[in-house]
Amino acid sequence: CPALRVGALSHCLLPSRGRVGVAGVRGLELRELGARYADEALHLMLHELERRNVRAAACNAKIFGGGNMFPAQRGAGVPVGRRNGEAARQLLNAHGIEVVSESLFGQGHRQVVFDIASGDVWARQLPPTDGGAGASA
């Protein structure tokens, strides 16, 4: 919510722990939630918005990522990056948060800069670093 100078950023590794769906986090205490999971990260963000008396629907979202970090690895199923991006879209929609900008999928990773004072985000997509055999920082 740029007008309120409230913002959040999460780098999700997985859509969920596997035992919960994108419909919500069930059976976990707030202190047990992990921001590495998209559904739990959003739950933590919503909790902090509520603590600040900010309605989630008054906010907007910009989502980035979902790139295939390991395109050389041909496995079965949908790549985790795509699953993360799709989960982010579904979760935000389920909570009435409008996505105003996105840069999702493709190959490689993104570098993101988030200016919380203005709400501006800059991102650039970079190719996989080593042919998909492993990740580097």
Residue ranges and their predicted role:
Residues L13-R17, G65-M69, F105-Q107:
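Acidic, glycine-rich active-site loops and adjacent beta-strand->loop/helix elements
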Residues A57-G65:
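Short glycine-rich phosphate-binding loop at a beta-alpha junction
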Residues C1-R52:
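Conserved mixed alpha/beta catalytic, RNA-binding, or beta-rich assembly cores of soluble enzyme
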